[in-house]
Amino acid sequence: MLEGCILAVSSQSKSNAITNNSVPGAPNRVSFAKLREPLEVPGLLDVQTDSFEWLVGSDRWRQAAIDRGEENPVGGLEEVLAELSPIEDFSGSMSLSFSDPRFDEVKASVDECKDKDMTYAAPLFVTAEFINNNTGEIKSQTVFMGDFPMMTEKGTFIINGTERVVVSQLVRSPGVYFDETIDKSTEKTLHSVKVIPGRGAWLEFDVDKRDTVGVRIDRKRRQPVTVLLKALGWTNEQIVERFGFSEIMMGTLEKDTTSGTDEALLDIYRKLRPGEPPTKESAQTLLENLFFKEKRYDLARVGRYKVNKKLGLNAGKPITSSTLTEEDVVATIEYLVRLHEGQTSMTVPGGVEVPVEVDDIDHFGNRRLRTVGELIQNQIRVGLSRMERVVRERMTTQDVEAITPQTLINIRPVVAAIKEFFGTSQLSQFMDQNNPLSGLTHKRRLSALGPGGLSRERAGLEVRDVHPSHYGRMCPIETPEGPNIGLIGSLSVYARVNPFGFIETPYRKVENGVVTDQIDYLTADEEDRHVVAQANSPTDENGRFTEDRVMVRKKGGEVEFVSADQVDYMDVSPRQMVSVATAMIPFLEHDDANRALMGANMQRQAVPLVRSEAPLVGTGMELRAAIDAGDVVVADKTGVIEEVSADYITVMADDGTRQSYRLRKFARSNHGTCANQRPIVDAGQRVEAGQVIADGPCTQNGEMALGKNLLVAIMPWEGHNYEDAIILSNRLVEEDVLTSIHIEEHEIDARDTKLGAEEITRDIPNVSDEVLADLDERGIVRIGAEVRDGDILVGKVTPKGETELTPEERLLRAIFGEKAREVRDTSLKVPHGESGKVIGIRVFSREDDDELPAGVNELVRVYVAQKRKISDGDKLAGRHGNKGVIGKILPVEDMPFLPDGTPVDIILNTHGVPRRMNIGQILETHLGWVAKAGWNIDVAAGVPDWASKLPEELYSAPADSTVATPVFDGAQEGELAGLLGSTLPNRDGEVMVDADGKSTLFDGRSGEPFPYPVTVGYMYILKLHHLVDDKIHARSTGPYSMITQQPLGGKAQFGGQRFGEMECWAMQAYGAAYTLQELLTIKSDDTVGRVKVYEAIVKGENIPEPGIPESFKVLLKELQSLCLNVEVLSSDGAAIEMRDGDDEDLERAAANLGINLSRNESASVEDLA
């Protein structure tokens, strides 16, 4: 079924300078890390795959649960079926129960589902058991419950052929929450408490400014809390015995007018059901249903756990009940009263002492994750509850003898609920496939939005802000910049989700000042109770802290120094607090947080280039991120490569089995980028299990490679790189260094219409042979054809209704006696502004038994690939939030060059660094030069001080080395300065860059040196998805809006540019009266004038006088609607008649010129097709 979902690939452990990747065959990256990580990075997709395996109850999940110590683990589907069972009829004489959910094989492979627009799903079967309680008869059947979407190995779902991701949702955990507010009028501190269930009515208690304790049931009117206690069967004496210590409770009891349980119940009933006649029985039932019946009220396991923990109840006992108990209510009231009276602890009836304090709702101990499994489970629960109603009705209407489980069950509501979730839920999202990192980050995203979460309009600053409890759980850097800032986050590298949905992070246990190798995963609540040291606290070889005072974090994120024996735990890694994308920024510790945020986000926007190149300066995270993203091909077993081609790789495993891996070739991703895999192994080569054997998009030798290493000079250049503009060398254009391939999909279908069937054909009316040159006999463009905007990709004709014939046509009909074919051209054409080469065609036809929507006979898809070279206006960025638009591309000979004649590739402005405080880019530039040139530290006279912390392996490295500088544990400034002075000379024996990282550059135009030395080095530059080709747009004539008669807006509609109020003022200020008149009339909504002008331009005549714009006529109509008599007079006082612009001359002129100046707003569905 679903076993083996996760790529079991282990991470990198750094025991010495060369990263000994536990991924075999990985490229060696020289690492500047000083610390050993005792724990490998967990599977980066586990947050998705583990949750789904819990839902379907896979064997792998079950075994892991048993290993954790669970006796009888229950999967998500089993759990929801157990909740539903048994469904009883209204008399209780019949019942239907469900058990044992299981899956058949999936219907089609992932590739086939993508190709044919199918859903990757497996049939779900359950055992349904019908019991007739009167006769004791039992009927059992296996029932099909619909096709259930399955998760792919990459943690995604294929829904109707598109790849989607279900994002984990951050919500407030069910439980009991105490709050504190200050009354504005009396300035008294007031306290309140909410009991929030997973499902059911809220119960709220509060102390008001008159010092009475009140209760609100299900958000209705407030009542004295003693009314609720009496309704639960408490007498005045019992209340006094339990709460006698509290004046405010005694005061509330005095003000309470109800005398006993019955009166209290009726009082509550009147508040909850005003207008209905109260009876004791109905009041009792109502209260029980509200809080004490599992069908109506569910705290959920996590809610029960939180309530027990907060109030000190049932300590050490397993969680059984999920409803409220009487003791819960009483303990909550006592806790509230003690909190209000300023007490700091209370002892509950079991002898457990609990601290009394206010809760912080933004703390990660009070916020949990609803992962994909739980989100789908909730949706199935909704579908099953709808089905339950149908089953109950059918039990009463059908003949008891003939009833079988199959006749009772209607699976439609369940199937519809699942479909609705995957198709329309805010948390089921179109996967971000711009590059492998964007896909990986999307799967690890945490969203506070969505059903049951926050809305971006109502979310305040507190919930968006970074909280101390986020440490090691949610990245404080990576979040969107817009209105969603702080509401959408990313899971930290080492974080995992526990069975209750709380995020845990690992720590190393410290005992008596000695760091052990024991790893404990702690939730935010548990971490608050401990003292935690940071990962780089100095220790000796035995793990004992070398300093007497150690810097630690305590509750609330406060930092202080304590003695070594007070430390409980220590971080496992310096990169523990950040997400995958943030952990890929070298020298992150030298960047301002705002720019680091942009850097992390912009890495996700990098487009895959024709030739990927891994960064010279990495962080050691590149390999693991690329493998877990799933876009590279990994060998499953150890063996020998038997055969390699561009399309597949065959491995002969050591156990005698042969396995072929198919490679994706030039496939289109969700974002139109090119996903292409290529082998990196040779026939006869030995490979280990887990080794990368083929690269995907944006990877090189299995490492993430989002951009290019370019030789950068940081200097102003003639003002052409002012305001973040970038100057590039023409070499990058000519040699396709920053060239990317983009693939667009164009689709057309042939339907049945009221006038007959549409036809895909080469026989298109009124089209020349030149236009049809690239179409085959079916009317579909050939593969390899170069196409431009307006070219026909697929010829299609649609029948049209009979029209009035002209006398000439009638004469022709009479002579030749044939009825000309009444069809119109509805061919698929290349949209404006697009061009490229046809690389693929897929034809689906009803005749070939392909699944097509109702009414569609044939469907054709054409894939057009575009090779986009870098050009002016494209956006480039580094990894430190340093982004800019290309302002100028210079010939290579004009670029500044080094003393040996090497021209630089890119010039960035110096002003982009100081106020943005992203110094990481400068350090990266220096280290990039060191890595490219190679280095050799002179240790003949002893190791220099600056190199004392470097291991021996780092004393020298050849040219073109790749280095890793992990976040918070990378190369230090002193080491960089020393390495710059130790770089290897070039082949002429010269060192190009000085020890301060600068070089004398020469002007390419004059050959003169620039007056000052310039920082030169290698920086990793990304080409972002904001390409000028997608944005540039021009219009001569085009569609007009039917209503305003003005041109439409936007590139998609082939619209014009808006000339607004302020632009008109600018024209007035310049006195450009005729230009302004032209803009407001013939270029806009003067319907008569624009046709005449077009005619004049075609015939080469002078431009005629403008007419009256349509908007002026609208103004007149508005004034007339206000009962004002408005006349328009010419300059000599003669009245001008305002005619509507639909005269025949206009239409005839337009028809003669072959132009259509009206908006093609489709009149019918057939026209749209």
From Swiss-Prot:
Catalysis performed (reactions): RNA(n) + a ribonucleoside 5'-triphosphate = RNA(n+1) + diphosphate
Entry GO CC: DNA-directed RNA polymerase complex
Record's keyword terms, sorted: Antibiotic resistance, DNA-directed RNA polymerase, Nucleotidyltransferase, Transcription, Transferase
Annotated coiled-coil segments of the chain: none
E.C. numbers: 2.7.7.6
Keyword Nucleotidyltransferase annotated: yes
SUBUNIT field: The RNAP catalytic core consists of 2 alpha, 1 beta, 1 beta' and 1 omega subunit. When a sigma factor is associated with the core the holoenzyme is formed, which can initiate transcription. Interacts with RbpA, which partially restores Rif-inhibited transcription.
Additional notes on this entry: Mutations in the RRDR sequence (residues 423-449) confer rifampicin (Rif) resistance. Rif blocks transcription initiation but not elongation.
Family: Belongs to the RNA polymerase beta chain family.
PANTHER family for this protein: DNA-DIRECTED RNA POLYMERASE I SUBUNIT 2
Role noted for this protein: DNA-dependent RNA polymerase catalyzes the transcription of DNA into RNA using the four ribonucleoside triphosphates as substrates. This subunit often mutates to generate rifampicin (Rif) resistance. Interaction with RbpA partially restores Rif-inhibited transcription; once the subunit is Rif-resistant however RbpA no longer stimulates transcription.
Protein name: DNA-directed RNA polymerase subunit beta
Origin species: Mycolicibacterium smegmatis (strain ATCC 700084 / mc(2)155) (Mycobacterium smegmatis)
Record lineage: Bacteria, Bacillati, Actinomycetota, Actinomycetes, Mycobacteriales
